[in-house]
Swiss-Prot record:
Pfam families: Hormone_5
Domain of life: Eukaryota
InterPro entries (alphabetical): Neurhyp_horm, Neurhyp_horm_dom_sf
Compartments in which it is found: Secreted
S-S bridge residues: C10-C54, C13-C27, C21-C44, C28-C34, C61-C73, C67-C85, C74-C79
Stored Gene3D superfamilies: Neurohypophysial hormone domain
Its job: Neurophysin 2 specifically binds vasopressin.
Leader sequence residues: none
GO molecular function list: neurohypophyseal hormone activity; V1A vasopressin receptor binding
Quaternary structure annotation from Swiss-Prot or TrEMBL: There is an equilibrium between the monomeric and dimeric forms. On peptide binding the dimeric form predominates.
Name of the protein described by the UniProt record: Neurophysin 2
Taxonomic lineage from the root: Eukaryota, Metazoa, Chordata, Craniata, Vertebrata
Length: 92
């Protein structure tokens, strides 16, 4: 079994590669917000062909999602607003 620590970050995506893929049609970045089902997220479909699992985002949220941008929690298929993702996002 692989621990969370060993999962690589998903592919970069979006303007300037500043986002990360969170699902096959979801690209999010701290400064970008989230693109769902748009051209910015097309690259994320490439993850389907890569053998190793990936996980973007630092902080878990909801039931099995990850904080993707300020106030946004993303799952593989969709994103929802999530107040707990506002707090200290990206600050360690």
């Amino acid at each position: 079994a692989m621990s969370d620590m060993e999962l690589r970050q998903c592919l970069p995506c979006g303007p300037g590669g500043k986002g990360r893929c969170f699902g096959p049609s979801i690209c999010c970045g701290e400064e970008l917000g989230c693109f769902v089902g748009t051209a910015e997220a097309l690259r994320c479909q490439e993850e389907n062909y890569l053998p190793s699992p990936c996980q973007s985002g630092q902080k878990p949220c909801g039931s099995g999602g990850r904080c993707a941008a300020a106030g946004i929690c993303c799952y593989e298929e969709s994103c929802v607003t999530e107040p707990e993702c506002r707090e200290g996002a990206g600050i360690h």
